[in-house]
Regions:
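PLP-dependent class I/II
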Residues: 1-149
């Protein structure tokens, strides 16, 4: 919420609208509405700039860590979001674990993430990196030590 699509191709526009309607994540709510108003105000401008710096560093750190330390897990550095989409297909195949087992192992060590299947990722997990860097580091270390073993 708070982003805009400019789609000139009518067929692509219809497809984009159809896909975005399949999830409640594309619906405005009271909190997101006020956050959007604040972000576009003069007072919100500096805060948004600082936030973008933090989120960019979080994403860079997490992607580099995952590529180096979590064999069988792949990730693409996102453009314009703080959500990672971890592809666990190779890890699950090699380890014999299901995606549900991997998700549960993360929850058990305090890493709260989201099933990627509702977002068209059959073997994916969504991870939100909108938090302080120290928490990102702790989460990555826990994934390496306890989950993707």
């Amino acid at each position: 919420i708070g982003s805009y699509h400019i789609v000139y191709n009518e067929a692509l526009h219809k497809r984009m609208k159809k896909e975005s309607s399949l999830s409640h994540y594309n619906s405005m709510n009271v909190l997101s509405m006020h956050a959007l108003i604040g972000a576009y105000s003069d007072e919100g401008s500096q805060w948004v700039d600082e936030l973008r710096e933090v989120l960019t560093e979080n994403v860079k750190y997490a992607c580099k860590f995952i590529r180096k330390n979590l064999p069988g897990v792949s990730v693409q550095q996102p453009e314009g979001t703080y959500m990672l989409f971890l592809d666990c297909e190779e890890y699950c195949r090699c380890s014999g674990r299901t995606l549900d087992e991997v998700k549960k192992a993360g929850y058990e060590v305090g890493v709260v993430w989201q099933d990627g299947r509702p977002f068209h990722g059959a073997h994916h997990i969504r991870m939100n990196l909108a938090l302080p860097m120290e928490k990102v580091i702790i989460a990555m270390d826990r994934l390496k030590e306890y989950v993707f073993i």
